[in-house]
Amino acid sequence: MRGPRLPALPALLWLALAPLPGPAARAELRVRVRLPGGQVTEESLQADSGSDCISLELRKADGALITLTADFRQEVKIFRALILGELERGQSQFQALCFVTRLHRNEIIPSESMAKLRQKNPRTVRQAEEVRGLEHLSMDVAVNFSKGAQLSSHIHNVCAEAKEAIYTREEDVKFWLEKGMDGSMFEVLPQTSDLPDLQRCKLCTDRWKPCICSYSLSIEWYPCMLKYCKSRDAAGKVSSYKCGIRSCQKGYTFDYYVPQKQLCLWDEET
């Protein structure tokens, strides 16, 4: 039975925007967060203000390792899931997926601000102050791993285990093509409109038939906005300064084509 959830603590009680040790800093913050089922896990947040990127990593209750990399310089967001395989059903030890989408302004705090975050009480279990709506994304385009560095240099490292399973959306591809990206790195995947017999994997009974797979993940806690406080000097002039962060939680569901249901055994009717 799930116990009562603790109210979110104000960010100002535990996070401080400390000065950076140098002009470009790498920093890591580890926070304890509560998963939807009530379990507590540790989430790692890393920021590199030099390359202008951040990375968040946490383990789901089912053992899957979820990583979100935000590349501010290229306006690219990379989700990676390392999913434990079902060995008794012929799967490998783990399965890797990468979902690449456009990073919009103000989705998450800048890397420079993330690198400054410090925690006053590391044992406290964090809970997001704001729950942002579930985003359901149709990942209808495959990304060529060998050419993906043009999109973001982080794809080479983050998606190394998912070379044949990197997905994005056609609407994001249009945005990147307008920025001058090479279109040869993208391949449009089959859809139900192209193949009338193409089913959702959870409805497909043949493990060797192609289908549309769904995978859901949630970033349970991340700094989504900066908070500003006001101060007044001796002359009475009011000025604003950064004094903390607001935390958010957001869930995602990705739909994408797989050549056989064997690659999507978690998506079954229960």
From Swiss-Prot:
Domain of life according to the entry: Eukaryota
Alphabetical keyword list: Signal
Matching InterPro entries: Oaf (IPR026315), Oaf_C (IPR053897), OAF_N (IPR053894)
Signal peptide start and end residues: 1-24
Classification via Pfam families: OAF_C, OAF_N
Similarity annotation: Belongs to the OAF family.
Protein's name in the database: Out at first protein homolog
Gene that produces this protein: oaf
